[in-house]
A protein has these predicted regions:
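Generic N-terminal segment detector
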Residues: 1-72
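Active-site microenvironments in enzyme catalytic cores
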Residues: 40-151
Length: 151
């Protein structure tokens, strides 16, 4: 298995417990556009020498370059009730009924790259917000051909 890390110094790949620098010519944009991102990454590492690893994990960046972040799905059932209650006054509570009973998941825009927090990074919550409902997320890296190549 390959693990790809984005760091301030560049991309780093972990393979079989060893860490390798990715040539700077190979970008995250190129990986997202490649038909086979893993093969492209492996080819770029043919002449790579291992580097000291593990120390980069405190300085990870979000693993995207110019990609927008989109989401698919619905919120957890417990949150559904809260969201329906909060939107009832505006008449939007029926919106969630439609989302939960749809044949396919809802697709919605989440963020542009500069608004994505790095792993372990802080998030901003509006000062006028009375409450916040954090939920776990699973993120998939999907190339331009629709193939999942990372998570």
């Amino acid at each position: 298995m390959l693990r790809l890390y984005s760091t301030p110094a560049g991309l780093i790949v972990e393979r079989d417990g060893a860490f390798f620098p990715v040539p700077q010519a190979l970008t995250l944009d190129a990986l997202f556009s490649a038909a086979d991102p893993a093969a492209l990454l492996l080819a770029a590492l043919l002449d790579a020498r291992p580097i000291a690893g593990g120390d980069h994990k405190g300085t990870l960046l979000a693993p995207l370059q110019s990609q927008e972040v989109w989401a698919a799905g619905v919120t957890y059932y417990r949150s559904r009730t809260a969201r329906m209650a909060e939107s009832k006054d505006s008449g939007g509570d029926t919106f969630y009924d439609k989302v939960y009973e749809a044949d396919r998941p809802e697709i919605f825009f989440k963020a542009t790259p500069h608004r994505v927090a790095a792993p372990g990074g802080g998030v901003r919550i509006r000062s006028d917000s009375r409450w916040n409902v954090p939920e776990p997320e699973l993120t998939l890296a999907i190339n331009s051909a629709g193939k999942i190549f990372g998570y």
